[in-house]
Curated annotation (Swiss-Prot):
Name the UniProt record assigns to this protein: Exodeoxyribonuclease 7 small subunit
Keyword Membrane in annotation: no
Organism annotation: Pectobacterium carotovorum subsp. carotovorum (strain PC1)
Function: Bidirectionally degrades single-stranded DNA into large acid-insoluble oligonucleotides, which are then degraded further into small acid-soluble oligonucleotides.
EC nos: 3.1.11.6
Pfam families according to UniProt: Exonuc_VII_S
Disulphide bond pairs: none
Family from the record: Belongs to the XseB family.
Amino acid sequence: MPKKTEQPVSFESSLNELEKIVTRLESGELPLDDALNEFEHGIQLARQGQQKLQQAEQRVQILLSDDPDAPLSPFTPDNDAL
């Protein structure tokens, strides 16, 4: 079966979904296979969130650069980090 192409979601949506996954896992009521699937999805969301935070930090660093004459250029994230 081909892998689903996932649409990019906001950081806040990812965090909300991750919190729901943690709650379901902590309940201890999921069968093992379901728990592993939830855990895998949670890891993916956590990595995506971490990447978005790193990109935001890079943008802030560019904006707060000590060199006032430095040209501002559009930030282009490196999507290979995942």
